[in-house]
């Protein structure tokens, strides 16, 4: 029997509460997701039969080896705009062999306002005939299209969408680039940003952020600090973050293209980086009292954990409670949890997004 939304949420609450009980956190703050139409992106295989074309996903059988093809005619967890476009796009592909020949995947990326980018992926070279057909399709459906094949990328319109998220009455614009990481659940993302700003409660000193991505948290958090230094290694994310800072007219943020490990080396004076000099970033000019981290699923490495322990406040957003738990074993030696939250980014899956504010004991 399948669980209701509230049942699956309650099981996550119980699991997280039990897992972190040894750290004696305050009461868990819970932020729910819409039950349907919450995903702003979706990826499907395009399945070909003798006389049909349809969206497909794969489901492994019980032994985990054989994959079963599941036909997908609608996708209730995806945003309404994706569900509305899916059949229209499929009919256009079926009607035009130039667009359907050797296509094997279609990826959708949308925004709360309905702006749409569709990536069509092929097992063949994309020629001028394809480009002409794709331009006509983009115009007809009022979407942006990206064509991809091995070693080839053809952009019809733009390779990004612009999301607008509201935090405490202010709207922030975010460039979200195709194939770069973005938060998939925009409604819950707004709740995460609002919570992060609420728990910080302002500072007359500076914020250090590691793993900043496209500046998702950086922009709203910057309003609560004198200056912000944010680090990110991926070039496309750094580019998007710089665009977002400029578009939102925020002037107290600098972006350093460094990994967390590299920043630790630079901060401790162990290594100099030309990238910092070229960006005119003087780390020693900052007076940090707070560090914000939103690391990948693997969590934070030991050297970076040592860096975190030197900060008065640590705001940690985690997409993996197991690595957060392991990191807290170290951080709880010097800090205590003063805020604790669960964000249901991924309803009906085992994945849990959580947040903790840690303050120096």
Swiss-Prot record:
UniProt superkingdom: Bacteria
Catalytic residue list: 319 (nucleophile), 353 (proton acceptor)
BP GO terms, sorted: tRNA methylation
Enzyme Commission designation: 2.1.1.-, 2.1.1.35
Reaction equations catalysed: uridine(54) in tRNA + S-adenosyl-L-methionine = 5-methyluridine(54) in tRNA + S-adenosyl-L-homocysteine + H(+); uridine(341) in tmRNA + S-adenosyl-L-methionine = 5-methyluridine(341) in tmRNA + S-adenosyl-L-homocysteine + H(+)
Keyword S-adenosyl-L-methionine recorded: yes
InterPro entries, per database record: MeTrfase_TrmA_AS, SAM-dependent_MTases_sf, TrmA_MeTrfase, U5_MeTrfase_fam
EC category name: transferase
Keywords: Methyltransferase, S-adenosyl-L-methionine, Transferase, tRNA processing
SUPFAM superfamilies found in the cross-reference section: S-adenosyl-L-methionine-dependent methyltransferases (SSF53335)
Binding-site residues for S-adenosyl-L-methionine, renumbered to this chain: 183, 211, 216, 232, 294
Record-level Gene Ontology MF annotations: rRNA binding; tRNA (uracil(54)-C5)-methyltransferase activity, S-adenosyl methionine-dependent; tRNA binding
Cellular component terms (Gene Ontology): cytosol
Family matches, as Pfam families: tRNA_U5-meth_tr
Role, per record: Dual-specificity methyltransferase that catalyzes the formation of 5-methyluridine at position 54 (m5U54) in all tRNAs, and that of position 341 (m5U341) in tmRNA (transfer-mRNA).
Similarity section: Belongs to the class I-like SAM-binding methyltransferase superfamily. RNA M5U methyltransferase family. TrmA subfamily.
Entry-linked PANTHER family: TRNA/TMRNA (URACIL-C(5))-METHYLTRANSFERASE, TRNA_TMRNA (URACIL-C(5))-METHYLTRANSFERASE
Descriptive protein name: tRNA/tmRNA (uracil-C(5))-methyltransferase
Lineage, uppermost ranks: Bacteria, Pseudomonadati, Pseudomonadota, Gammaproteobacteria, Moraxellales
């Amino acid at each position: 029997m399948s669980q209701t939304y509230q049942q699956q949420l309650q099981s996550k609450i119980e699991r997280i509460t039990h897992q972190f009980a040894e750290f004696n956190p305050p009461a868990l703050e819970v932020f729910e997701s819409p039950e349907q139409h919450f995903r702003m992106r979706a990826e499907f295989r395009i399945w070909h039969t003798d006389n049909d074309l349809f969206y497909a996903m794969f489901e492994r059988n019980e032994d985990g080896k054989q994959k079963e093809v599941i036909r997908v005619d609608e996708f209730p967890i995806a945003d309404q705009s994706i569900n509305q476009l899916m059949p229209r796009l499929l009919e256009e592909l079926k009607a035009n062999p130039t667009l359907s020949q050797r296509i094997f995947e279609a990826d959708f990326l949308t925004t709360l306002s309905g702006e749409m980018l569709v990536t069509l992926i092929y097992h063949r070279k994309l020629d001028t005939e394809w480009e002409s057909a794709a331009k006509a399709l983009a115009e007809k459906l009022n979407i942006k299209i990206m064509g991809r094949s091995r070693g080839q990328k053809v952009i019809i319109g733009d390779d990004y969408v612009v999301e607008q998220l509201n935090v405490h009455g202010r709207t922030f614009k975010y460039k979200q680039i195709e194939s770069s990481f973005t938060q998939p659940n925009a409604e819950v993302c707004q709740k995460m940003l609002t919570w992060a700003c609420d728990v910080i409660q302002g500072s007359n000193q500076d914020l250090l952020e590691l793993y900043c991505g496209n500046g998702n948290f950086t922009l709203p958090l910057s309003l609560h600090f004198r200056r912000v230094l944010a680090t990110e290694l991926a070039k496309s994310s750094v580019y998007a973050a710089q665009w977002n800072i400029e578009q939102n007219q925020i002037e107290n943020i600098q972006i350093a293209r460094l990994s967390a490990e590299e920043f630790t080396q630079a901060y401790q004076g162990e290594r100099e980086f030309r990238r910092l000099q070229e960006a005119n970033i003087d780390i020693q000019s900052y007076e940090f009292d707070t560090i914000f981290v939103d690391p990948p699923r693997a969590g934070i490495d030991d050297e970076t954990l040592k860096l975190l322990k030197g900060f008065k406040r640590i705001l940690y957003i985690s997409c993996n409670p197991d690595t957060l738990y392991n990191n807290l074993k170290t951080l709880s030696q010097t800090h205590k949890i003063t805020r604790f939250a669960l964000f249901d980014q991924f309803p009906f899956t085992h994945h849990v997004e959580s947040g903790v504010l840690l303050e120096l004991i």
